[in-house]
């Protein structure tokens, strides 16, 4: 794909849900970052004339500083995004973000144990690099059906493969950015793909996939990414909204002009 003609149309939304008193999810699109609950999706359209990033971080529930950890994770990734050159640089940055969280914990003992799960999409030239740590998910739409690209770092995560139609997973996070009392290196999952016009990517926190199975998620998708994101969030709320809900949809296409 000629990156000079490549355009990303992105719709994104985060919501605290019906139960949580605060939103520990944070979403980012390059240098735009949001953690406050939203009433409707934002839509951003941009040329892929430089490295672009879409990311969701979910602060670990039951840990101190979940909201701080998710914002810090997104902010650090967003700051580094312009320097992404490929999967190796994404891996290095994620490992650095993990170390950064532990450095913050060491400097501020009251924040010990804070952490976040993360999923993101970095577009570098003609390639899309999908990355995740934890149980936030990334899908690609193929023929109208979603295929899982990320790998759950959770108990039962091995069962959540691309053929799993339940979309549901048990909890018990096996890996996160930060999240422990002392430093542990992180081993992010990376999938590198050649970007193609017409592709759609879906990023989401577990507040979506805990409420909706894959069939229900697919039923919410339309040609309009903003409407699709809104329908997904509303469906998760109607199903209970037990956790914070964050969704990003990325449509890739060529500029007709």
Language-model features: where?
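PP2C/PPM-type serine/threonine phosphatase catalytic domain
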Residues: 1-257
């Amino acid at each position: 794909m000629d990156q000079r003609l490549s355009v990303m149309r992105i719709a994104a939304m985060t919501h605290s849900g019906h139960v949580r008193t605060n939103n520990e999810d944070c979403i980012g699109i390059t240098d735009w970052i949001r953690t406050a609950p939203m009433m409707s999706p934002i839509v951003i359209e941009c040329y892929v004339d430089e490295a672009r990033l879409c990311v969701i971080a979910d602060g670990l529930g039951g840990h101190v500083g979940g909201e701080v950890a998710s914002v810090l994770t997104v902010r650090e990734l967003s700051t580094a995004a312009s320097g992404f050159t490929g999967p190796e640089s994404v891996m290095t940055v994620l490992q650095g973000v993990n170390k950064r969280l532990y450095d913050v914990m060491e400097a501020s003992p009251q924040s010990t144990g804070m952490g976040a799960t993360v999923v993101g999409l970095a577009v570098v030239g003609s390639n899309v690099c999908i990355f995740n740590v934890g149980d936030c998910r990334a899908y690609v739409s193929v023929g109208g059906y979603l295929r899982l690209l990320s790998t759950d770092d959770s108990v039962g995560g091995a069962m959540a493969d691309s053929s799993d139609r339940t979309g549901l997973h048990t909890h018990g996070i096996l890996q996160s950015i930060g999240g422990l009392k002392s430093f542990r290196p992180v081993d992010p999952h990376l999938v590198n793909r050649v970007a193609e016009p017409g592709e759609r990517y879906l990023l989401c926190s577990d507040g979506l996939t805990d409420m909706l199975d894959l069939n229900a998620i697919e039923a919410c998708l339309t040609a309009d990414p903003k409407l699709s994101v809104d329908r997904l969030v509303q469906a998760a709320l109607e199903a209970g909204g037990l956790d914070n809900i964050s969704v990003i949809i990325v449509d890739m296409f060529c500029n007709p002009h």
